[in-house]
C-alpha cells in the first residue's frame, strides 16, 4: 500500500501519520476539527512533542495531506480509525465517535480497502458494531469485498525513549485474510507485529494492559493511605521493594488517575462483562479507590492548612502541574481539575502553574476553567499563596525554589524528597 487515510489527528493519529510518512507511505489525515486542519496545513503542531519542522516538511512535500472531507479517502487503500472512546456519566461506553466515523467512511470505501480500528474498546466492538455499519454503508461484505482489523494504539506521550516504530503492534483480523492485509500494511512502519487470533482477542489485550495499571495503581494508593496512618513513607517502601530483581514491578501513588486510557478503559470491560453475567469486582474496586484519591488529597490539604491556623475556605491555593502526567501538555481527565473543582467548592481561591499548559483550552468537561492562564513562576506570585499543591511531577519545575518561596507544600508526587525545606511545611500526600 502506498496511500492510506488516518481518521483522528490527535495524540494517536498524528504520530502514526508521521511514522507512515517516514516509511514512504503517503497519508491523508482526516479530522472533524477545522482548527487542527488549519494548524497542520500551516505546519503548526498542537501537540507539544510533535515536531513542527517534520509536519511542515511532510505537508510541503504532499506526503501528508489533511482535510475534513471524508470523500477524499476513496482514493486511498486503507483507513485507520483513531478517534476517542470516552465513557458516559454512568461509566457506560460511548462509541459515538467510532460509529459516526464508520458512517462517514462507509460510502467512500473502494473495493479491497482495509479498515482498521485503533481506538480502545470492549471485546466485540469491531465485529458487532463497526462491521455492520461498514457493510450497510458500502453495500459490500467484510472479509470478501473489503478487509477489517483491530490494532490498539500504544502511545506513551512524554517518554523520549518511546518511538512509534519500536512499540510492538498487536492486531487481530475479522478473517485470516484481513489479518494478513493488516500485517502487510503495518509492517511497513512498525518493527514488530504481534498477531492474535481475532479482533476480540486484540481488543481484550488492550483492556488487560490498562486494567493492569489501574489495579496496581489502586493498590499503592490504598497502601499509601494505610502507611500514612502508620507514619511510614510509601515512596521509601516502594523504592526499597523495587530492588528485588524478580516478582515485583514498581507502581506509584498519586492524586488520582488521568489521561484518556487508565481512568476510562477498565469500565468498558465491566460494562461488557455484564452481558455475559460476569461481575468484575476487583476492577470496579480499583476504580473506586483511584476515583477517591482526590478526596484524600483534599483532606491532607486541610490538615496542612490547619497546622498554619488556616482553613481551606478563604485560602489561596496554587496547583503545581495540571497535565495528567509529567512532561506533557495533555490535560485530558487530569485529576488536577478534580482538585481545583473541590478546592473551589470549599471556598478556596485556586490558581495553577504548568509550564506545558500556559492557558486552559476549551473543553466540554471543564468549560468553566477555559481561558484561565498559568501564573508566572516568580517569587512575588508564588509567595502570595497559602499552600502549593504538587499534582504533576514536571522535570522543568524548580522544586527547591518552590520550597523556598512557599510556607506550605502538599506533595503528591515525592518531588520534594531530599530537598531542604526548613522554612516550609511539607506534607507528602
Regions found by a protein language model. Give the residues of each.
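Structural/interface elements that position substrates and couple domains in central-metabolism enzymes
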Residues: 1-429
Amino acid at each position: 500500500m502506498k496511500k492510506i487515510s488516518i481518521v483522528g489527528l490527535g495524540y494517536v493519529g498524528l504520530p502514526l501519520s508521521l511514522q507512515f510518512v517516514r516509511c514512504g507511505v503517503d497519508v491523508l489525515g482526516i479530522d472533524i476539527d477545522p482548527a487542527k486542519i488549519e494548524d497542520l496545513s500551516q505546519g503548526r503542531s498542537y501537540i507539544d512533542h510533535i515536531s513542527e519542522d517534520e509536519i511542515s516538511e511532510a505537508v510541503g512535500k504532499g506526503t501528508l495531506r489533511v482535510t475534513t472531507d471524508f470523500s477524499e479517502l476513496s482514493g486511498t487503500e486503507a483507513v485507520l480509525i483513531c478517534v476517542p472512546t470516552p465513557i458516559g456519566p454512568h461509566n457506560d461506553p460511548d462509541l459515538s465517535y467510532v460509529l459516526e466515523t464508520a458512517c462517514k467512511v462507509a460510502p467512500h470505501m473502494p473495493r479491497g480497502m482495509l479498515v482498521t480500528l485503533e481506538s480502545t474498546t470492549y471485546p466485540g466492538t469491531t465485529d458487532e458494531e463497526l462491521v455492520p455499519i461498514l457493510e450497510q454503508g458500502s453495500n459490500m461484505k467484510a472479509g470478501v469485498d473489503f478487509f477489517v482489523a483491530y490494532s490498539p494504539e500504544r502511545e506513551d506521550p512524554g517518554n523520549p525513549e518511546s518511538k512509534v516504530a519500536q512499540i510492538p503492534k498487536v492486531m487481530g483480523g475479522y478473517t485470516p485474510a484481513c489479518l494478513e492485509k493488516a500485517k502487510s500494511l503495518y509492517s511497513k512502519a512498525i518493527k514488530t507485529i504481534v498477531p492474535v487470533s481475532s479482533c476480540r482477542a486484540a481488543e481484550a489485550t488492550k483492556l488487560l494492559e490498562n486494567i493492569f495499571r489501574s489495579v496496581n495503581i489502586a493498590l499503592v494508593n490504598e497502601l499509601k493511605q494505610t502507611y500514612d496512618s502508620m507514619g511510614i513513607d510509601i515512596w521509601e517502601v516502594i523504592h526499597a521493594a523495587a530492588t528485588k530483581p524478580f516478582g515485583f514491578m514498581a507502581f506509584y501513588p498519586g492524586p488520582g488517575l488521568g489521561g484518556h486510557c487508565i481512568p476510562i478503559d477498565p469500565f468498558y470491560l465491566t460494562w461488557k462483562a455484564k452481558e455475559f453475567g460476569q461481575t468484575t469486582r476487583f476492577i470496579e474496586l480499583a476504580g473506586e479507590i483511584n476515583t477517591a484519591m482526590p478526596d484524600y488529597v483534599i483532606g491532607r490539604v486541610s490538615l496542612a492548612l490547619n497546622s498554619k491556623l488556616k482553613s481551606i475556605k478563604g485560602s489561596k491555593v496554587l496547583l503545581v502541574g495540571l497535565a495528567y502526567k509529567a512532561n506533557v501538555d495533555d490535560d485530558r481527565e487530569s485529576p488536577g481539575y478534580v482538585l481545583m473543582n473541590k478546592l473551589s467548592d470549599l471556598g478556596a481561591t485556586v490558581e495553577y502553574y504548568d509550564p506545558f499548559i500556559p492557558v486552559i483550552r476549551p473543553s466540554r468537561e471543564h468549560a468553566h476553567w477555559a481561558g484561565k492562564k498559568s501564573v508566572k513562576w516568580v517569587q512575588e506570585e508564588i509567595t502570595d499563596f497559602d499552600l502549593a499543591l504538587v499534582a504533576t511531577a514536571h522535570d522543568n519545575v524548580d522544586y527547591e525554589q518552590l520550597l523556598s518561596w512557599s510556607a506550605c507544600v502538599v506533595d503528591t508526587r515525592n518531588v520534594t524528597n531530599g530537598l531542604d525545606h526548613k522554612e516550609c511545611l511539607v506534607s507528602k500526600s
